[in-house]
Amino acid sequence: RRVLFRSCRTSLERRGDKGTGWCMAWKACLWAKLGDGNHALTLLKNQLRLTREEACSLVGGGIYPNMLCAHPPFQIDGNFGFAAAVLEMLVQYEEQKIVFLPALPDEWKDGMAEGVKAPGNITLNFKWKEKRVTEINLKSPIDAKLVILYNGMEEEIVLNAGSSYQKTLI
């Protein structure tokens, strides 16, 4: 897996950050998956550059005044990809593991997320301060056994259908 991540990083570095809206969103998702939230945020900020509706350019991305992704013609991939990248920076789920703040940018040292859905329709609500998780609330409509990773800690939990798991950290 490390070899694949290293190869992905090298490919992203060589290709650079320029591209259309959907392409920048995709690259932001990949940088977040690699754990580099600062680079992912740079791409998202580039995607939020306002562009003129009458301008037709195949490079540079940006958004139209109505907040739709600029890529002649408009493609929803950029908007959905932008949201996916933000979530990928805040929480990742893989093989029954939920990782909180895996790629948190330095600029987002305090915050919260509510209503994030993980596979199995598990609802995640969490807060952080100074880049450390301070509260976790999980709710599942089904029985679930999973591992949560936060603040360098790993914890195995069991969720019973309809019940909540809550943790407050100091």
Regions found by a protein language model. Give the residues of each.
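Short alpha-helical interface elements
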Residues: 52-56, 111, 151
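Active-site core of glycosidic bond-cleaving carbohydrate-active enzymes
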Residues: 1-93, 134
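Catalytic cores of secreted or luminal carbohydrate-active enzymes
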Residues: 73-124
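Beta-rich accessory regions
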Residues: 1-23, 32-40, 113-170
